[in-house]
Amino acid sequence: MTFKDKVYIVTGASSGMGREFVKQVSKKEKFDEIWVIARRKEALESLKKEVKAKIRPITLDLQNPEGFDTYKKLLAEEKPEVALLANIAGYGKFGKYDEISLEDCRGMIDLNCKALVAMSQLTIPYMKRGSKILQLDSLSAFQPVPYLNVYGSSKSFVLSYSRALNRELKTKGIRVMSVNPGWVKTEFFDHATKSSNDAITYFNVMYDAKDVIKTAIRDLYHTKKDVSIHGFQIKAQVLLVKLLPHKIVMEIWMRQQKHK
């Protein structure tokens, strides 16, 4: 296949981590265009005023299967060389199991897992040696987390999928890295905790999206890591989770949240 323009593709680019990623990554290596994908057209359009790079807003609902038909056709028509795919779109609802609707449960799986896989599968054929895939994951991927049971499980899937895919694509010279932050103050966080009532009340440390993204980009371009973790406390927590039985880890979490 003969490729045309060299592009970056970023999902979830309308706000939070995705928007911050676009701002920072636009200053990296030379490329022709950044395709920014999200549902809110106005928010995507406004990125043009904040980023000097050429931006192409693409309004898609990644929870709707028809969105992938549109994306597939766009790739076939444009035939871009995709130097970077950043799957940052995500959906979370935190709280007690009976306070989260079935619609939200299915929505988390659809966007966090199914959409991420679909974007990866459709995009890889347009990548060359040296291309990269970044998957926004979560600290919750490393352990079972009560009151984040569906969200955390969806992120465990992302971690396993990303690491396995990274190994598969090694011979093609395509890199896959998951980014596993702790608590980050964003619009996503506000939405996820909005209906959690008293289920989650303790947040040990809150990070800034700018710092998490800065670390992620550094790790993506200057290391061979398949997992990026920002912050000493989060790195220590990941190590602890690996050393202790998950039953004990869950008990510690429950006590932190003041649940029996």
Could you describe each region identified by the protein language model?
Residues 96-97, 104-106:
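Substrate-binding pocket helix/loop in short-chain dehydrogenase/reductase
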Residues 171-232:
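SDR active-site lid
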Residues 30-46:
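Conserved glycine-rich Rossmann-like NAD(P)H-binding loop of the short-chain dehydrogenase/reductase
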Residues 88-93:
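Conserved NAD(P)H cofactor-binding loop of Rossmann-fold oxidoreductase domains
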Residues 120, 154:
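Active-site helix of classical SDR
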Residues 138:
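Residue(s) in the substrate-gating loop at a strand-loop-helix junction
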Residues 14-15:
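Conserved glycine-rich cofactor-binding loop
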